[in-house]
């Protein structure tokens, strides 16, 4: 691997790590997708697939947008109990494979001790850890009558040097795009009204360089 290629790889890895490294305040459990739904997407910029907070507030995300709602105390406690049960499974650790399939998810458990688990395979085709597969399926498909569209107050800028097919757009935010190369910076939602958000990236021209930029929605109290 040449020095230029190695540097680019480390740059992208650092940005991805920073994008998924922050904690959501008061979270009980968070599920994030680590695989792109479509070619060219930036999976680390997609909103979390599922978030449950200690007060029963819940967020459900897709490729770019989120819905927010609130669970009854009994509903939240049921999910918490299932999480406790999963923690006690034999073979449960930092990385598990459920079975076949290219899917990769990050399960972030926060209540009762922080623990991040990379889960590989399609939970619908699980051959091991059925309780974990069942929980993951429930959270990935989660629906609730209280859910309403969530409008974030800010976004995290995830950027890397590169090009996309077609033209590029002018950078319109106050802080230079290069400031987000090693660690995402936040921008107000009001300034991002005409930008694609979530996993769908934009091509940006700034000076003599071009960047691939994605805006990840931030939850209340979350920092990039």
Feature map (PLM): residue ranges:
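Bacterial N-terminal signal peptides that target proteins for export
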Residues: 1-7
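Hydrophobic h-region of N-terminal signal peptides that target proteins for export
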Residues: 10-20
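Short, well-ordered, aromatic-rich surface patches in folded extracellular/luminal domains
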Residues: 19-38, 42, 91-224
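Short, flexible N-terminal segments of the mature chain
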Residues: 42-63, 178-183, 187
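Amphipathic, non-membrane alpha-helical segments in soluble helical-bundle scaffolds
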Residues: 45, 73-76, 126
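Short beta-strand segments
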Residues: 48-50, 67-69, 113-119
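A short, structured loop/turn motif at beta-sheet edges
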Residues: 54-55, 73-76, 109-115
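A short-motif feature that recognizes glycine-rich, charge-decorated loops
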Residues: 59-91
